[in-house]
């Protein structure tokens, strides 16, 4: 049973639309039809009453009161409006005259009806109605068909009661006119049957049209579902914004979400790449220290602080990049104050261990008063990448100098290597771009350095060094000190 229910529930939008609209159409059709039929029925009753009242007036005109007796003379040429039977009563309810002797019909007339004008109905079985219409062969044939279908069927006859006050020539009379043709056999009664047929035909025609309308109306949703499937299959990057007005906001928000998720994914991937690159230096120092321990060039007591320092740096770098990955655009930068000289001393010390075999000579010309305003890890990451690049490509010498203004910090790194061709001085800051493809590397370090300096409204300018190699000028902006709390 549950499986069967799952096949139908939850219902699709098309089925919901079809069922809801069909229900509305059915209810409205029934409501309008019932109003029309009730109105027609009321109008039919009024018309019938007027016809029977006219018949009653005719008999009142033909009636004569002579010798305390009622006489009604019917001319042979009178054309009655419909087959009827007339009964005339006095004010006490006593039958004075009957057009025909039909005992069962006389018993059906209620005494209360004779007190006032009114329109009533009486129920009779098919056989009694047949006796009442014994002279009408066409009606008899119809009654026979009804009898064959249902021998216990009842026929409804309309009854009009009209009370006439006493006059100088006539006492008070009550004339009852009975329509001998039952309502069920009148052509007007067929309206009820027609209504059923019309309603059925209406539904049979409307449901296919509603299905077409639902298909056409829900095409934008089907198109959206198709685009979502294409997104899942990686055949599409964004949803088509050219859709219906009702779906525009949804599509726009979904596209924003997709773009945000894609940017977050790219950011995580970039951060992971940057983290991998940043761990190269401390891992290289650890590797160099382990070699020194193995060759007994360094004692355990000397190697321990070096290794602990690099492990601490690895931990800091992991925390730093995790923090960067979780930061959103526009996050305020740290406003901490850090002396530049000690930070560069630690970096050069680590790089000397990495490039120990190469014998790189790194010289510093940094005033103790020069400070960096910002996050320490940002500074270490930028200068670590720039200095690593200088040590990698230099022949022997690397020189570092710095100066500071109210708003900017300038750090210049020069080497005596082959330098950077003029045509490559902008390309090297793009991810994956390298001047020398023969040396190991991924082309990530300078790109990371530039991205961080841009967060400080700064930049890195590549040029030619007086030593004959490359000259990298790192410029940090936003270096005004934060106001101190008093």
Swiss-Prot record:
The chain crosses the membrane at residues 17-37, 195-215. Disulfide bonds: none annotated. The record marks 202 as: Plays a critical role in the switching between kinase and phosphatase states. One of its GO terms (cellular component) is plasma membrane. Residues 1-16, 216-486 are cytoplasmic. It holds the Pfam family PhoQ_Sensor. Residues 274-480 form the Histidine kinase domain. It catalyses: ATP + protein L-histidine = ADP + protein N-phospho-L-histidine. It is found in: Cell inner membrane. Residues 38-194 are periplasmic. A divalent metal cation binds at residues 151-152. The modification Phosphohistidine is found at residue 277. It comes from the Bacteria. Its EC number is 2.7.13.3, 3.1.3.-. Keywords: ATP-binding, Cell inner membrane, Cell membrane, Hydrolase, Kinase, Magnesium, Membrane, Metal-binding, Nucleotide-binding, Phosphoprotein, Protein phosphatase, Transferase, Transmembrane, Transmembrane helix, Two-component regulatory system. It is a multi-pass membrane protein. Residues 215-266 form the HAMP domain. GO terms for molecular function: ATP binding; metal ion binding; phosphoprotein phosphatase activity; phosphorelay sensor kinase activity. Homodimer. Member of the two-component regulatory system PhoP/PhoQ involved in virulence, adaptation to low Mg(2+) environments and the control of acid resistance genes. In low periplasmic Mg(2+), PhoQ functions as a membrane-associated protein kinase that undergoes autophosphorylation and subsequently transfers the phosphate to PhoP, resulting in the expression of PhoP-activated genes (PAG) and repression of PhoP-repressed genes (PRG). This is Sensor protein PhoQ. It comes from Escherichia coli O6:H1 (strain CFT073 / ATCC 700928 / UPEC).
């Amino acid at each position: 049973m549950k499986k069967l229910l799952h096949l139908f529930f939850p219902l699709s939008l098309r089925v919901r639309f079809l069922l809801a609209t069909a229900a509305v159409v059915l209810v409205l059709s029934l409501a309008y039809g019932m109003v029309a039929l009730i109105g027609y029925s009321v109008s039919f009753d009024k018309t019938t009453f007027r016809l029977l009242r006219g018949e009653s007036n005719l008999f009142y005109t033909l009636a004569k009161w002579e010798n305390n007796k009622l006489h009604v003379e019917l001319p042979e040429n009178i054309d009655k409006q419909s087959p009827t039977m007339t009964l005339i009563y006095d004010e006490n309810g006593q039958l004075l005259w009957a057009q025909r002797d039909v005992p069962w019909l006389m018993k059906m007339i209620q005494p209360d009806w004779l007190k006032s004008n009114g329109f009533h109905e009486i129920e009779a079985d098919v056989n009694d109605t047949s006796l009442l219409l014994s002279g009408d062969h066409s009606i008899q044939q119809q009654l026979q068909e009804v009898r064959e279908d249902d021998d216990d069927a009842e026929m409804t006859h309309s009854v009009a009661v009209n009370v006439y006050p006493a006059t100088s020539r006539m006492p008070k009379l009550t004339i009852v006119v009975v329509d001998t043709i039952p309502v069920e056999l009148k052509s007007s009664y067929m309206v009820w049957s027609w209504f059923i047929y019309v309603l059925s035909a209406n539904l049979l025609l409307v449901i296919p049209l509603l299905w077409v309308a639902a298909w056409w109306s829900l095409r934008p949703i089907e198109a959206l579902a198709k685009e979502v499937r294409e997104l899942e299959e990686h055949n599409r990057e964004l949803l088509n914004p050219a859709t219906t007005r009702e779906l525009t906001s949804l599509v726009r928000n979904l596209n924003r979400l997709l773009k945000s998720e894609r940017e977050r994914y790219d950011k995580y991937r970039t951060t992971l790449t940057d983290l991998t690159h940043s761990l190269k230096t401390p891992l290289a120092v650890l590797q160099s220290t382990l070699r020194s321990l193995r060759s007994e060039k360094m004692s355990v007591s000397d190697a321990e602080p070096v290794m602990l320092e690099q492990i601490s740096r690895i931990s800091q770098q992991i925390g730093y990049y995790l923090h960067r990955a979780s930061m959103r655009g526009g996050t305020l930068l740290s406003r901490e104050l850090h002396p530049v000289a000690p930070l560069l001393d630690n970096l050069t010390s680590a790089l000397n261990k990495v490039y120990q075999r190469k014998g790189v000579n790194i010289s510093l010309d940094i005033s103790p008063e020069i400070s960096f305003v910002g996050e320490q890890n940002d500074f270490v990451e930028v200068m670590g990448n720039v200095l690593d690049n200088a040590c990698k490509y230099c022949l022997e010498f690397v020189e570092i100098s710095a100066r500071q203004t109210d708003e900017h910090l300038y750090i210049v790194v020069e080497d005596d290597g082959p330098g950077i061709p003029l045509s490559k001085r902008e390309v090297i800051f793009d991810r994956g771009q390298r001047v020398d493809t023969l040396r190991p590397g991924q082309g990530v370090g300078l790109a990371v350095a530039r991205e961080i300096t841009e967060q400080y409204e700064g930049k890195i300018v590549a040029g030619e060094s007086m030593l004959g190699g490359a000259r990298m000028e790192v410029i940090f902006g936003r270096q005004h000190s934060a106001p101190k709390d008093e």
